Amino acid sequence: MGGYKGIKADGGKVNQAKQLAAKIAKDIEACQKQTQQLAEYIEGSDWEGQFANKVKDVLLIMAKFQEELVQPMADHQKAIDNLSQNLAKYDTLSIKQGLDRVNP
């Protein structure tokens, strides 16, 4: 991966970040589905009363929050992919070569 004074990127770390971001995205989606299913199970069960309703409401709030994390996580993955691709090209950019001549 490319680099310039003050700009450092370790190719292995960027790849690790890509792998971890993919795992996190997958885990968030799985967790959201499980939370939603649990809320639906409670709603359809014989468990009734104020406490049951509060537990279900909390689970629905959690499921909504988890659902809202899906798009930002996808954006994060795209940003890491773009970083990886652009850093690989960094050393060949004419602006970088010009900066090297000005600031050796």
Curated annotation (Swiss-Prot):
One of the Pfam families matching this protein, by short name: WXG100
Any one GO CC term of the record: extracellular region
Alphabetic keyword roster: Secreted, Virulence
Keyword Metal-binding belongs to the record: no
Main localization, broad class: secreted
InterPro entries: ESAT-6-like_sf (IPR036689), T7SS_ESAT-6-like (IPR010310)
SUPFAM superfamilies: EsxAB dimer-like
Keyword flag Membrane: no
Superkingdom field: Bacteria
Function in brief: Virulence factor that is important for the establishment of infection in the host. EsxB is required for EsxA synthesis as well as secretion. Mediates together with EsxA the release of S.aureus from the host cell. Also inhibits host cytokine production and thus modulates dendritic cell-mediated immunity.
Subunit organization: Homodimer. When mixed with EsxA does not form heterodimers.
Protein name: Type VII secretion system extracellular protein B
Organism: Staphylococcus aureus (strain N315)
Taxonomic classification: Bacteria, Bacillati, Bacillota, Bacilli, Bacillales
